[in-house]
Amino acid sequence: MFLLYEYDIFWAFLIISSLIPILAFFISGILAPIRKGPEKLSSYESGIEPMGDAWFQFRIRYYMFALVFVVFDVETVFLYPWAMSFDVLGLSVFLEAFVFVLILIVGLVYAWRKGALEWS
């Protein structure tokens, strides 16, 4: 029971930092005007009247390419601390990292065969 006294500041900070955004959204919802005129519903293109339809579809290839990039970018974030402390951690952590990289290589080969890396 006495060990919980060390976390009083943490809990107070957590409660206050949770209440501030909730109160901000609540107060802005009360004070904000709710009129939706034609200007509010029109598309905005850098201060110029929109020409044509403002909504158009992107090709799924862009999303797939970005998704593969994010996966391998996160992989580097996970592998960097491991590489910096490789000499301290030992063989078991090396094997775990090897399995991690192997799974990612299998994913890369799968994405390659499905054509997710083809740009044309």
UniProtKB/Swiss-Prot annotation:
UniProt cross-references to Pfam families, sorted A to Z: Oxidored_q4 (PF00507)
Quaternary structure and interacting proteins, as annotated: NDH is composed of at least 16 different subunits, 5 of which are encoded in the nucleus.
Species in which this protein is naturally found: Jasminum nudiflorum
Similarity field: Belongs to the complex I subunit 3 family.
Protein name: NAD(P)H-quinone oxidoreductase subunit 3, chloroplastic
Annotated InterPro entries: NAD(P)H_OxRDtase_bac/plastid (IPR023043), NADH_UbQ/plastoQ_OxRdtase_su3 (IPR000440), NDAH_ubi_oxred_su3_sf (IPR038430)
Record has Metal-binding as a keyword: no
Membrane-traversing stretches: 9-29, 64-84, 88-108
Membrane topology: Multi-pass membrane protein
Domain of life: Eukaryota
GO CC annotations, alphabetized: chloroplast thylakoid membrane; NADH dehydrogenase complex
The reaction(s) this protein catalyses: a plastoquinone + NADH + (n+1) H(+)(in) = a plastoquinol + NAD(+) + n H(+)(out); a plastoquinone + NADPH + (n+1) H(+)(in) = a plastoquinol + NADP(+) + n H(+)(out)
